[in-house]
A protein has these predicted regions:
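Exposed, interaction-prone extracellular/peripheral surfaces
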Residues: 1-33, 37-204
């Protein structure tokens, strides 16, 4: 009771990708709705910090069903990021660190495809800082094509956050290397979340 929950939501350009029934952005918004529903009531409050890279939306923590519904609607209506606009999950988390907030729950919703500084993800330090005052959950949002490439012959791969494109031939070797790199990245994300004291859920 009287739990304060904060959603840290990454809606950068890489989330505007999807090859399944919905894109990753839609999965992220569904995760927002689920957390808001599960944590409301009993004097609990929920708020959010959402960023596309170009625009940041801050929604104060409040209680009640009307607030939860309005919050999810505002997140869903946030304009999509422009191609070439980089996201910054670390900046979202820093926003939650300062000023210090009452002890509660922080739920981070992202595909965790952000940049690294050496072997460390740039979002690790601010997330570790949040762990001193909050319980943490990381919700990793994935598309099947984040994990493996289909056999499609010649395709153009694009990075939505830089705008860079590259034409490749999806040979068996390339597909194996892509799958191995994707699996290694997911293992690194899981290890980083554990180091920060965060539980992990995966949506795909």
């Amino acid at each position: 009771r009287e739990l304060e929950t904060w959603l840290a939501v990454d809606l950068s350009a890489s989330l505007d990708f999807g090859t399944a029934e919905c894109d990753k952005r839609e999965l992220a918004i569904a995760a927002c709705a689920a957390v808001a529903h599960l944590t409301r009531g009993g004097g609990n409050r929920v708020g959010a910090v959402v960023s596309t890279g170009a625009q940041t939306l801050r929604i104060p923590a409040r209680g009640g069903l009307p607030h939860a519904r309005a919050m999810v609607r505002r997140v869903a209506e946030l304009p999509r990021a422009a191609e070439g606009e980089r996201g910054d999950l670390a900046a979202i988390l820093e926003t939650l660190r300062r000023p210090p907030r009452r002890r509660g729950l922080v739920v981070v919703i992202s595909d965790f495809l952000g940049a690294r500084s050496g072997e460390v993800f740039e979002w690790e330090r601010p997330l570790r800082g949040l762990s001193a005052r909050h319980d943490l959950i990381g919700i990793e949002v994935l598309d099947p094509r984040d994990l493996e490439l289909p056999d499609m012959g010649t395709v153009v791969l694009a990075d939505p956050e830089t705008g860079r494109q590259k034409e490749v031939v999806t040979t068996p070797l390339l597909r194996r290397e892509f799958a191995a790199a994707a699996a290694a990245h997911r293992d690194d994300v899981a290890s980083a979340l554990r180091r920060c004291g965060a539980a992990q859920l995966t949506l795909r």
